[in-house]
């Protein structure tokens, strides 16, 4: 059994905003609130970034049109005692997806981590 850090991308819809910075703040806040309400405080929530297609420079993953924004969020969770990478992905999607119902999630990276930082917790 191994431990993994799983990174996911989420697409968050924010209505009635006029600026992308406001939309990003609302998205991070709402996602954090929903995770906290379901005792998932251990999930890290950050604004997502995407690369410029022309120069590759990173910029905020938010698109604003008609006072409605689609914000990309980066969610990270540590999974302990998983049988494989695929098992860690399923556990992560189940944990986060249960709290963030109706929010599209995509696994973007799975990294096997070293040993017993917090090995007594089992996220299954």
Swiss-Prot record:
Positions the record marks as coiled coil are: none
Give the highest taxon in the source lineage.
Archaea
What is an example of a Pfam family matching this protein? Answer: DUF555
What NCBIfam families does the record tag this protein with?
Answer: PRK03922.1
The family classification in the record reads: Belongs to the UPF0212 family.
What protein name applies here? UPF0212 protein Hlac_0869
**Upper lineage:** Archaea, Methanobacteriati, Methanobacteriota, Stenosarchaea group, Halobacteria
């Amino acid at each position: 059994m191994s431990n993994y850090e799983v990174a996911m991308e989420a697409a968050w819809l924010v209505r009635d905003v006029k600026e992308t910075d406001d939309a990003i703040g609302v998205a991070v806040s709402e996602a954090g609130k929903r995770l906290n309400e379901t005792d998932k405080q251990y999930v890290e929530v950050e604004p997502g970034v995407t690369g410029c297609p022309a120069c590759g420079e990173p910029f905020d993953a938010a698109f604003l049109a008609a006072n409605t924004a689609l914000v990309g969020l980066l969610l990270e969770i540590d999974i302990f005692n998983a049988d494989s990478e695929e098992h860690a992905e399923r556990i992560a999607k189940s944990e986060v997806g249960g709290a963030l119902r109706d929010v599209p999630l995509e696994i973007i990276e799975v990294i096997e981590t070293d040993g017993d930082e917090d090995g007594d917790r089992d996220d299954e």
